[in-house]
Amino acid sequence: MTDVTAPVGVLDSGLGGLSVLRALRQRLPHEDFLYCADCGNAPWGDKSVQWVTERCDEIAHFLVSVHGVKALVLACNTATAAAADHLRTWMPIPVIGIEPAVKPAVQISRTHCVGVLATAGTIASPRYQSLLTRFADGADVISVGAPGLMECVERGEFETPATLSLIRRYVEPMLKKGIDTLVLGCTHYPFLTQALRCVVGPDVTILEPGDAVAAVAETRLADTAGLKAAGCGRELFYIRDSEKHETVLRVLWPAARKETVLELPF
């Protein structure tokens, strides 16, 4: 039987998964969340599938054996593509992954031309290619790997000239091809929404995945009788190289306090 008081684990390569944690907190106000960010090894998007899978395994074992989490949210597209299926083979709890919102983007696009910004690892993965096969439905889906954007978020450079220049490099070719919908295929990218909006203008719809992931998490917890129905939920953060990243963490999650930010011990 699920212990409803147990925390929910949230795993990401860095701080971008806080965009998913934000959606989880809004939908599940009573839950305690334990957020693990492997900032010291980020980015994961250019690492091998084997490396990402082994690292996710290591963090997942820590969350289950030390903290007894009742569910695990992979708040990272690269981690989902590389490791979700493997983690589900041994974890005795729900494992909720994240995927680029190709299906809803195709459904709402008026021009039948959709852009996807993601990491190279996500775009090259069989899981993403399967997503396109199932849901592109004849639309022109322009997939662009965007190295450097994740690092902009990790450094707290959300709207600097350098960040805007990088965004233009990736997005302007999509705009010339006629996209009217842009899918953010990395959980870091929602923190660049204002900068992205400056480049794409007011008429392009920007889709981020946090709300959909939170809805799935709520359903899976309900299915396992794991929903916590009362109390004020708390967050605890395990960050690799926490001192280096604590300032940006506090910008992205102002409620974080020094005593709730711990060093990921491996």
Model-derived segments and their meaning:
Residues M1-F266:
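Non-catalytic structural scaffold of enzyme domains
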